[in-house]
């Protein structure tokens, strides 16, 4: 591989990982300007609409707990494909939700599946980079993760000048579809000989151990 091709590949990789990192904050904050107008259309209360944020946050937390162990066992590519495909579907569910109950379901699934990409993006970074390069790559991903929540409401507000909140979720579905294509083209970065056994079962045992540890809970 020539230096030019290596640089090009590295740029493509960084863009892909950055997009994976951005999907969760974008899905969280892009529709925030629409919160005041959503209760009337869905015939519900403002507090129920605000629950869509909390439900997604719970999904994100759950997905981050198990996304990493799954990718360590199965590799990076298959969980990425599955997560992004389900994120497309969940975004469509949100876009066409006829009721608050369906919207809450879609938001939970959106958080659960979108967070898988965020976790795996960091794992892929560790697969490809080491030392100072890894530090720089993590810094870039953290910058994207920090900028997305700031920019997303501004973009969402501008979109609402021309369209409805449902289109915002359609845009998120398109964004996830682009990530799905990227996942299909992505070359597996974790060889079979480097994968671990146990996966979710081992992770669950570790989480239970931490929950039972009074010293750990005392520091949280």
Q: Each PLM stretch: what is its role?
A:
Residues 62-101:
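Conserved MFS/SLC helix-loop-helix module at the cytosolic interface between two early adjacent transmembrane helices
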Residues 10-11, 96-106:
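Helix-loop junctions at membrane interfaces in 12-TM secondary transporters
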Residues 90-95, 106, 110, 126, ...:
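MFS-fold secondary transporters
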């Amino acid at each position: 591989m020539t230096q030019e091709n290596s640089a090009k590949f590295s740029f493509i990789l960084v863009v892909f990982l950055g997009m994976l990192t951005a999907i969760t904050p974008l899905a969280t904050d892009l529709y925030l300007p629409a919160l005041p107008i959503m209760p009337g259309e869905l015939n519900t209360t403002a507090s129920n609409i605000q629950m869509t944020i909390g439900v997604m946050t719970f999904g994100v937390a759950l997905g981050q707990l198990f996304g990493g162990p799954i990718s360590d066992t199965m590799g990076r590519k298959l969980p990425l494909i599955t997560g992004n495909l389900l994120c497309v579907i969940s975004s469509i569910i949100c876009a066409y939700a006829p009721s608050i109950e369906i919207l809450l379901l879609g938001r939970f699934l959106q958080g659960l599946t979108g967070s898988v990409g965020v976790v795996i993006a960091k794992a892929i970074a560790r697969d490809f980079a080491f030392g100072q390069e890894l530090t720089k790559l993590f810094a870039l991903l953290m910058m994207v993760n920090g900028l997305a929540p700031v920019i997303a409401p501004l973009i969402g507000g501008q979109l609402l000048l021309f369209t409805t909140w449902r289109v915002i979720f359609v845009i998120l579905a398109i964004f996830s579809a682009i990530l799905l294509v990227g996942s299909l083209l992505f070359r597996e970065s974790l060889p079979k000989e480097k994968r671990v056994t146990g996966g979710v079962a081992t992770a669950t045992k570790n989480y239970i151990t931490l929950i039972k540890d009074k010293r750990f809970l005392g520091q949280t």
